[in-house]
């Protein structure tokens, strides 16, 4: 009886023990394989993360460069668009220095009303002197207000006009017309132009 039980136990126990041992061996191998794969996966993840970080950095850098270039181009275009506008406004709003001074002192230079006559051609009467005002009328570019100061009576003037010699007439015609214009230049030299016009009226 005892031998039968031993034989049955050995016949059943030995294959079970062998199977358990083989299962343990395969389990150990699988565990080692899993560990190796985990280490390999960790290395791969590190490499992938590094590549992703580099690609993201490159893309961000390229985007920054493109945005900076676009901003510089926009600034240049804006400056180019503003230049003609600034030149137009500067040309439209330019006021010469003498005109600013005259406009500022317009009220102080003409405080009193005087009898004025606007003429295009200056006329010098014999025996009289023409006293030109220093303020130019801004609405008429070629007209000046005049103030005629008579030093002689009408009878003396008629006598002097009839008895005036040629030398006196020449001196009267060549008398310099003084314009107290501190802003007179080559383009606004009214004195020379008026003198030439008066010389052209002389009989030859």
Swiss-Prot record:
The chain crosses the membrane at residues 6-26. It is a single-pass membrane protein. It comes from the Eukaryota. It is found in: Vacuole membrane. Its main location: membrane. Signal peptide: none annotated. Involved in cell cycle progression and surviving DNA damage. This is Altered inheritance of mitochondria protein 20.
């Amino acid at each position: 009886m005892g031998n039968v039980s031993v034989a049955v136990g050995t016949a059943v126990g030995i294959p079970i023990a062998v199977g358990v041992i083989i299962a343990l061996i395969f389990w150990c191998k699988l565990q080692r394989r899993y560990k190796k794969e985990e280490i390999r996966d960790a290395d791969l993840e590190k490499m992938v993360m590094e590549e992703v970080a580099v690609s993201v950095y490159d893309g961000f850098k390229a985007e920054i460069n493109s945005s900076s270039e676009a901003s510089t181009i926009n600034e240049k275009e804006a400056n180019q668009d503003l230049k003609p506008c600034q030149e137009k406004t500067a040309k439209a709003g330019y006021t010469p220095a003498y005109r600013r001074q005259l406009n500022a002192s317009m009220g102080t230079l003409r405080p009193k009303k005087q009898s004025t006559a606007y003429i295009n051609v200056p006329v010098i009467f014999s025996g009289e002197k023409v006293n030109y005002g220093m303020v130019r009328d801004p609405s008429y570019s070629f007209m000046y207000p005049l103030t005629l100061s008579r030093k002689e009576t009408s009878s003396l003037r008629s006598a002097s006009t009839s008895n005036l010699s040629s030398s006196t007439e020449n001196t009267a015609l060549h008398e310099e017309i003084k314009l107290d214009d501190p802003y007179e230049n080559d383009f606004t030299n009214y004195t020379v132009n008026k003198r030439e016009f008066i010389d052209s009226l002389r009989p030859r």
